[in-house]
């Protein structure tokens, strides 16, 4: 009898302890004042900028504001815009629309196969989105980038190259403005189009959050990396932009570390 009482007590204490951890984490996020965040430790080995905007409280944190205002090439974060435009003008039907691999061996093995709009987003297969940009065409692309006020709106670098270390540039703060409108579904696209692209951006889902994002890397030297997106939690939504002198993977790792630190990503 005493043994069973002991087991019940241990299980009860463990349950209470687990609840306390979640409750503390949840409370941490609920009372988060993003304007008072500190991310110095996360950037001690990397030059970069980080932006977090609390959509409910309309509070914004910016680390390294000077860099946050500097325009740089969007790299593969432009896939988000490319997909939105492609779906809107019906250059592609949906996230399952297949393009056949042309047999050319490219940088990453995961690119060397047939892809859909969705799989090419997840694997960041550049060739698929280059083909999509050609299908959209210069005139429609110019019109839409102007409508969106997307960075400097310059596609002179070529219809399938302009976002890749070329003519199109955008600042991290401009990226945040664009992503905020996407998160709220306030961009000038049809609602189903925005929902499809947001679904393709899902990086991971937990019991209490969903993380949406897209990386971007300057492949010529791995010296420019982005991770942009938003996270939905039990208490609200937050838009983030990370830009570093490193790879997109590094930018994502820094972002996830910060989101965990402040209780937005919970186990």
UniProtKB/Swiss-Prot annotation:
Domain of life, per lineage: Bacteria
Cysteine-cysteine disulfides: none
Pfam families in the cross-refs: Transpeptidase
Modified residues (N6-carboxylysine): 79
Catalytic reaction list: a beta-lactam + H2O = a substituted beta-amino acid
Signal peptide (from-to): 1-23
EC number: 3.5.2.6
UniProt enzyme class: hydrolase
GO molecular function: beta-lactamase activity; penicillin binding
Entry keyword annotation includes ATP-binding: no
Catalytic residues of the enzyme: 76 (acyl-ester intermediate)
GO biological process: antibiotic catabolic process; cell wall organization; response to antibiotic
InterPro entries xrefs: Bact_Transpept/Beta-Lactamase (IPR050515), Beta-lactam/transpept-like (IPR012338), Beta-lactam_class-D_AS (IPR002137), PCN-bd_Tpept (IPR001460)
The keyword DNA-binding belongs to this UniProt entry's keyword annotation: no
Keywords noted in UniProt: Antibiotic resistance, Hydrolase, Signal
Any one GO CC term of the record: plasma membrane
Binding site for substrate: 214-216
Family (UniProt): Belongs to the class-D beta-lactamase family.
Protein name from the UniProt record: Probable beta-lactamase YbxI
Source organism of this protein record: Bacillus subtilis (strain 168)
């Amino acid at each position: 009898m005493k043994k069973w009482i002991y087991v019940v007590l241990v299980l009860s204490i463990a349950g209470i302890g687990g609840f306390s951890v979640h409750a503390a984490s949840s409370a941490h996020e609920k009372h988060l004042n993003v304007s008072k965040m500190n991310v110095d430790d996360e950037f001690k080995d990397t030059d970069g900028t980080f932006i977090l905007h609390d959509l409910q409280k309309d509070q914004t944190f910016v680390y390294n504001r000077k860099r946050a205002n500097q325009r740089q090439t969007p790299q593969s974060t432009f896939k988000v815009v490319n997909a939105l435009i492609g779906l809107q003008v019906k250059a592609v039907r949906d996230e399952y629309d297949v393009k056949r691999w042309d047999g050319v061996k490219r940088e990453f093995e995961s690119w060397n196969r047939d892809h859909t709009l969705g799989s090419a987003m997840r694997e960041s297969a550049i060739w698929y989105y280059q083909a999509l940009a050609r299908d959209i065409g210069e005139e429609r692309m110019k019109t839409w980038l102007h409508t969106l006020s997307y960075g400097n709106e310059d596609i002179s670098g070529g219809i399938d190259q302009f976002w890749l270390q070329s003519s199109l540039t955008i600042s991290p703060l401009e990226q945040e403005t664009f992503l905020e409108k996407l998160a709220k579904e306030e961009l000038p696209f049809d609602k189903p189009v925005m929902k499809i692209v947001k679904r393709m951006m899902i990086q991971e889902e937990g019991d209490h959050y969903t993380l949406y994002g897209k990386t971007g890397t300057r492949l010529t030297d791995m010296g420019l990396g982005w991770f942009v997106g938003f996270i939905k939690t039990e208490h609200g939504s937050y838009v983030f932009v990370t830009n570093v002198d490193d790879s997109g993977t590094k930018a994502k790792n820094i972002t996830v570390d910060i989101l965990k630190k402040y209780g937005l990503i919970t186990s």
